[in-house]
A protein has these predicted regions:
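Basic, flexible Lys/Arg- and Gly-enriched helix-loop patches that mediate nucleic-acid binding at interfaces
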Residues: 1-173
Length: 173
């Protein structure tokens, strides 16, 4: 769970990370309890804030499994913007990655440039569909390593950290 404390005493992501001598871990974005995938952590508050701020339009890419009737009109609505509880939301891009017509669930790859709470689930719900799986595979220019097992972590190279910093014009992060 992406929280510092859980009153239900469920495991939290920060318990999996190594202890820091100075500062503390900050999550760059969060995933809700029913979402899997890439989480980024830093001890640099400026970097975290800049990467999460909507004005910087940092891309987040997801695999999305959806249950419901989906046609070209549905896809156009999701690309052009759909009303959800806190305003309008639109995918920067959305494409079918599973073309099997007989399945009740279809897989999509979608890109957003902000990270509002339950945004993807709310968007699909607005077009009478239900998200049954959601996996974040990319945040900015960092991809989820295919060989990384659920619950494991790996440290980014200094080159990857610099590339992330360059997305938001931060130097020496």
């Amino acid at each position: 769970i992406c929280t510092r404390n859980d009153y239900k005493k469920r495991p939290i992501v920060f318990d999996k990370l190594p202890l820091l001598n100075i500062h503390r871990w900050i999550s760059i974005g969060r995933l809700d309890i029913n979402t899997r995938g890439l989480l980024l952590f830093t001890n640099n508050g400026n970097l975290a804030n800049e990467l999460m701020h909507p004005s910087n339009k940092i891309e987040r890419e997801y695999y999305i499994r959806v249950f419901g009737k989906i046609n070209k009109n549905t896809m156009n609505i999701l690309k052009n913007g759909v009303k959800i509880k806190d305003g309008y939301a639109a995918f920067k891009s959305i494409q079918t990655i599973d073309h099997a017509c007989s399945k009740k669930n279809k897989w999509f790859k979608g890109v957003l440039c902000e990270g509002r709470n339950r945004e993807i689930r709310s968007m699909w719900q607005a077009v009478q569909c239900q998200v049954s799986r959601l996996i974040r595979i990319r945040y900015g220019n960092i991809f989820l390593p295919k060989n990384l097992k659920l619950g494991d972590w790996s440290e980014l190279s200094s080159e990857s950290v610099n590339n992330l910093s360059n997305l938001v014009s931060l130097k020496d992060s």
